[in-house]
From Swiss-Prot:
InterPro entries: US22-like. Pfam families: US22. Belongs to the herpesviridae US22 family. It comes from Human herpesvirus 7 (strain JI). This is Protein U3.
């Protein structure tokens, strides 16, 4: 280093060392930069490859399911013909897009889902619906001798005009609409069913904490927040969003509704999520009440309401923030501040599912029959 001279400052010395190295044929700096760039290119390529392969996998499962159900798709809107199909094709396995590694096992009937029970479950839906058993969910590795329905398995019920529902005796007073149409169910599987994430142990965010599985109370949630203060964790859904655990002193001066302001004041803030967690442009706050229930509140919506997200922190780990954006579960007793599913008789639902009729004449005929029975459905004048 003597050739650099004692009168050079630090920056000049660094520049001289770099320049000297770059003149060499086997430059260390050139090799390092090339290595880093190569790793970056490889990382981008792997991300693109993963996305494309996952999309291709889902499309392959969808096509496989459609092929297995080709006869079913000719009769699914006529329950009498459908029951005959199920009687002749017991234990036919249909692959699911989600959860990965699970299948729908078709069956003619399930114990505990007789006509009177089906009417009870149909009554959970906001407007008239008729249900019949389609099958139940089993793991792919299940042997042929374990195909029979077991208590607490997820049962798939088919409604009129191809609406698909999921139910389990673990939550007898809940019914989840997992598919607005047959095609949407085959493309998404049980993505709307919150219990499915617990079933396949699909966590929405990964945190390394030995005490996380014991968290139940509000105080334990706040202690967890303090242990991970300032830490950000990527959410599985929505894509590119994250959850950040941090402190915040709330004055609630931005909340115009006095009832909401009072309720928020009795809760404890523990985290926020969104694309811009600390900006005023897009931040959604997470609160826990004294019982450990979790709610979300949009700080940028002064007239907004609290939104029920999860019954507990343990449930929250699996379902994440899905209930803030979308909710597809009907309850016998609707939790306070919980969003209601879109009514299947509403004009929005009719518009949302209209594309099914582009390639499905049975769907169009069944929808015409539904409109004949309930003349106002699918119009702006209909009120749920």
């Amino acid at each position: 280093m003597a050739d650099l001279g004692s009168d050079f400052n630090f920056e000049e010395r660094v520049l001289r060392v770099v320049a000297k190295d770059l003149k060499k044929e086997n430059s260390f700096i050139r090799k390092y930069v090339a290595h880093v760039d190569g790793k970056k290119d490889l990382k981008v390529a792997n991300v693109e490859k993963t996305f494309l392969s996952d999309k291709k996998r889902k499309e392959k499962i969808f096509e496989s399911a459609k092929a297995k159900l080709v006869d079913f798709l000719r009769v699914y809107t006529n329950f009498n013909s459908l029951k005959m199909f199920l009687f002749l094709n017991p234990h036919l396995r249909v692959p699911l897009v989600f959860p990965e590694g699970f299948e729908l096992v078709l069956t003619y009937g399930v114990e505990g889902y007789e006509e009177d029970k089906l009417k009870k479950y149909a009554a959970l839906v906001c407007c008239p619906e008729e249900l019949t058993v389609l099958g139940y969910i089993k793991h792919t590795v299940t042997t042929v001798y374990e195909l029979e329905y077991e208590t607490d398995d997820v049962v798939i019920l088919l409604g009129k005009v191809g609406r698909v529902y999921a139910h389990t005796t673990l939550f007898p007073d809940q019914l989840c609409r997992v598919g607005d149409t047959i095609d949407s169910f085959l493309r998404k599987g049980l993505k709307r069913c919150l219990y499915a994430y617990v079933l396949c142990k699909c966590l929405q965010f990964e945190v390394s904490d030995p005490e996380i599985e014991a968290i139940t109370t509000c105080a334990e949630i706040l202690a967890f927040r303090d242990r991970h203060l300032g830490e950000k964790f990527e959410l599985r859904w929505p894509a590119r969003e994250n959850i950040l655990f941090h402190h915040r002193k709330d004055s609630f001066h931005f909340v115009s509704d006095p009832e909401i302001k009072s309720v928020l004041a009795d809760m404890c803030f523990f985290a926020s999520f969104g694309l811009k967690c600390f900006s005023d442009g897009a931040r959604i706050s997470l609160y826990a009440d004294c019982s450990g229930k979790i709610y979300g509140f949009n700080d940028n919506d002064p007239d907004g309401n609290l939104t029920f997200i999860a019954e507990s922190f343990q449930v929250f780990r699996f379902v994440g923030v899905r209930n803030f954006y979308k909710h597809h579960t009907f309850y016998a007793a609707q939790p306070k501040w919980c969003q209601k599913p879109l009514c299947h008789f509403s004009s929005r639902f009719y518009l949302k599912t209209a594309r099914q009729g582009d390639c499905d004449l049975l769907f169009l005929a069944a929808r015409a029959d539904e409109r004949a029975a309930f003349p106002d459905v699918g119009t702006q004048i209909f009120r749920c």
